[in-house]
């Protein structure tokens, strides 16, 4: 495992805090959750939502999006400088769903961004509370990761669509800060860097002048974030090469794609956080629960306990399966899009099935969809056990895995051996062995080839009963290894593309 001494814990990233002890961290994360909850309650009042309507996940998403848009300074500035017809840069809004005469109706609401900012700050004791905004971004990102497979985006940057287990956080906005960087997968970082290098190849001035200097600083920072995710010296040394390149070009793109592939076996450490929709925090705060006083952690039992006691509803299209919709949201809430399905199933206590077998589309409803036939149902977000979220990629061993996703990225700290199809992965490493990174490449390939099952399974704590809040009695589940566990395998999930 990479030395953790120099890194801040998630919660410190989450709250932009300096070194704090566990109690202070739990309190500051709790304070962030309180703020989101208070904001949500106020918005439900403004919008005159009934209790049921306030617990509707689609309404939650609209309200979350409104506040994120109100605080998106870059985009707001851009919109004011480039006015587009029919779009008021000072307003934000979206669809709000209400129950009228036994039917669901869609109502488009519009608010001044200034007003939304005022409500948000008021709910957060006058602060901008960036941590709370980032928290909502990560929830949206986790939902996207669970709903869509990024095949097209991978292919566009020259990567293999089967590397989708590396793509956590690929839809997070750039402004998501340290907490956002922590949850981005290796593939996401590689993709961002490749896009940057391609711009540099196509635009002579990209690295030049005052702007170019800022670009260069951003490039090196992204390289360092990616380097910090790798756990072997050779992978890190290769990242140093990429970062120090005077004029990044195709050689660097090659190196980055090589590194992304290597991460299927020599996995990076990627953080996982359970970020829940605002409509879960709102009712909890309304019922008098004081998150700051009680303390809260995004990586422990707290989100599981909160979901055990929450009622969340969702609109359901005529041919969708409510149980499948529940699975989608459960996975998003637990940041488990790239976890092994056997582990998720064990923790959830009901079978978690691959994306392609789910009869459900995304959670959001498009503006042209017919509301007349729309029903609603309760989302089942409870779990049988809980487990600590991990930030280690674990190691891997030779197991048969599938034709689609060829690896996973563990979410839960649970001991298991990891499925991946070594032959498939190693076949991708033919070709370029010369050039300035040849010795590192050779070393990385050697490590991948010698990955042996016994020394490289994922060592975790195990799962815990929900009554075991102190994580005192780990239960180590045994998994049927004949069954592999990728979520996106042999798959036809919709594409995420704006």
UniProtKB/Swiss-Prot annotation:
GO BP term, pick one: viral penetration into host nucleus
Sequence motif Unconventional nuclear localization signal, residues: 1-18
Motif extent (Bipartite nuclear localization signal): 198-216
Main subcellular location: virion
Gene of this entry: NP
PTM summary: Late in virus-infected cells, may be cleaved from a 56-kDa protein to a 53-kDa protein by a cellular caspase. This cleavage might be a marker for the onset of apoptosis in infected cells or have a specific function in virus host interaction.
Gene Ontology terms, MF aspect: RNA binding; structural molecule activity
Record-given protein name: Nucleoprotein
UniProt-annotated stretches for the region Disordered: 1-22
Quaternary structure note: Homomultimerizes to form the nucleocapsid. May bind host exportin-1/XPO1. Binds to viral genomic RNA. Protein-RNA contacts are mediated by a combination of electrostatic interactions between positively charged residues and the phosphate backbone and planar interactions between aromatic side chains and bases.
HAMAP family according to UniProt: INFV_NCAP
Similarity annotation: Belongs to the influenza viruses nucleoprotein family.
Pfam families, per database record: Flu_NP
Biased composition, class Basic and acidic residues, residue ranges: 8-21
Protein location: Virion; Host nucleus
Function statement: Encapsidates the negative strand viral RNA, protecting it from nucleases. The encapsidated genomic RNA is termed the ribonucleoprotein (RNP) and serves as template for transcription and replication. The RNP needs to be localized in the host nucleus to start an infectious cycle, but is too large to diffuse through the nuclear pore complex. NP comprises at least 2 nuclear localization signals that are responsible for the active RNP import into the nucleus through cellular importin alpha/beta pathway.
Positions of transmembrane segments: none
Gene Ontology CC: one annotated term: ribonucleoprotein complex
Keywords associated with the record: Capsid protein, Helical capsid protein, Host nucleus, Host-virus interaction, Ribonucleoprotein, RNA-binding, Viral nucleoprotein, Viral penetration into host nucleus, Virion, Virus entry into host cell
């Amino acid at each position: 495992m990479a030395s953790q001494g120099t890194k801040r814990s998630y919660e410190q990233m989450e709250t932009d805090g300096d070194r704090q002890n566990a109690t202070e961290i739990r309190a500051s994360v709790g304070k962030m959750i309180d703020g989101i909850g208070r904001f949500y309650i106020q918005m439900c009042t403004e919008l005159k939502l009934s209790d049921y309507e306030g617990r509707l996940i689609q309404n939650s998403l609209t309200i979350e999006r409104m506040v994120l848009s109100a605080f998106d300074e870059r985009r707001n500035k851009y919109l004011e400088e480039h006015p587009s017809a029919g779009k008021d840069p000072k307003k934000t809004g979206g669809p709000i769903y209400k129950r009228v005469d036994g039917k669901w109706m869609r109502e488009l609401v519009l608010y001044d961004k200034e007003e939304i900012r005022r409500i948000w700050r008021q709910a957060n004791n006058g602060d901008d509370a960036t941590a709370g905004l980032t928290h909502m971004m990560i929830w949206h990102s986790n939902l996207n990761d669970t709903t869509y497979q990024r095949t097209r985006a991978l292919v566009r940057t020259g990567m293999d669509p089967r590397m989708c287990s590396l793509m956590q956080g690929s839809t997070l906005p750039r402004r998501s800060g340290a907490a956002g960087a922590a949850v981005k997968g290796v593939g996401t970082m590689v993709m961002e860097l490749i896009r940057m290098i391609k711009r540099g190849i196509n635009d002579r001035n990209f690295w030049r002048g005052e702007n170019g200097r800022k670009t260069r600083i951003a490039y090196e920072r992204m390289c360092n974030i990616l380097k910090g995710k790798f756990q072997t010296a050779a992978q890190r040394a290769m990242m140093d090469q990429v970062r120090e390149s005077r004029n990044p070009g195709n050689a660097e793109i090659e190196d980055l794609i090589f590194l992304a592939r290597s991460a299927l076996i020599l996995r990076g450490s990627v953080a996982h956080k359970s970020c829940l929709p605002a409509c879960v925090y709102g009712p909890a705060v309304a019922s008098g629960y004081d998150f700051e006083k009680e303390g809260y952690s995004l990586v422990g039992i707290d989100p599981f306990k909160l979901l055990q006691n929450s009622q969340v509803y969702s609109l359901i299209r005529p041919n969708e399966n409510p149980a499948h919709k529940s699975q989608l949201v459960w996975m998003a809430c637990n940041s488990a899009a790239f976890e092994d399905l056997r582990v998720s199933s064990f923790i959830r206590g009901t079978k978690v099935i691959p994306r392609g077998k789910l009869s459900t589309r995304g959670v959001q409803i498009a503006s042209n969809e017919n509301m007349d036939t729309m029903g609603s149902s309760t989302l089942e977000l409870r779990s049988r056990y809980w487990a600590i979220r991990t930030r280690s990629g674990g190691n891997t061993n030779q197991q048969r895995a599938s034709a689609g996703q060829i690896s996973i990225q563990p979410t839960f700290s649970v001991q298991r051996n990891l499925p991946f199809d070594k032959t498939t992965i190693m076949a991708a490493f033919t070709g370029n062995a010369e050039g300035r990174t040849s010795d590192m490449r050779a070393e990385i390939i050697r490590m991948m080839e010698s990955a042996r099952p016994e020394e490289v399974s994922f060592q975790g704590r195990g799962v815990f009963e929900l009554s075991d809040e102190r994580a005192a009695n780990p239960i180590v589940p045994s998994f049927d290894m004949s069954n592999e566990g990728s979520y996106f395998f042999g798959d036809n999930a919709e594409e995420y593309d704006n």
